[in-house]
Amino acid sequence: MAVPKRKTSPSRRGMRRSADALKAPTYVEDKNSGELRRPHHIDLKSGMYRGRQVLEPKE
């Protein structure tokens, strides 16, 4: 079984845990419809992605 050779300092432990925090997802305003959507995702209401029609729009 692996055992640590040295004690982990509180500073190093905190730096390791700093990446574990959850953050709220980011949203951008769609240029055409003004709706909020995730960046690099399809706008589900219009079906547009990067200026192209990808899906049929929801009614």
UniProtKB/Swiss-Prot annotation:
Residues 1-16 have a biased composition (Basic residues). The keyword Ribosomal protein applies. Belongs to the bacterial ribosomal protein bL32 family. The keyword Ribonucleoprotein applies. This is Large ribosomal subunit protein bL32. Residues 28-44 have a biased composition (Basic and acidic residues). Signal peptide: none annotated. GO terms for molecular function: structural constituent of ribosome. One of its GO terms (cellular component) is large ribosomal subunit. It comes from Brucella canis (strain ATCC 23365 / NCTC 10854 / RM-666). Residues 1-59 are annotated as: Disordered. PANTHER family: 50S RIBOSOMAL PROTEIN L32, LARGE RIBOSOMAL SUBUNIT PROTEIN BL32. InterPro entries: Ribosomal_bL32, Ribosomal_bL32_bact, Ribosomal_zn-bd. Keywords: Ribonucleoprotein, Ribosomal protein. GO terms for biological process: translation. NCBIfam families: rpmF_bact (TIGR01031). Pfam families: Ribosomal_L32p (PF01783).
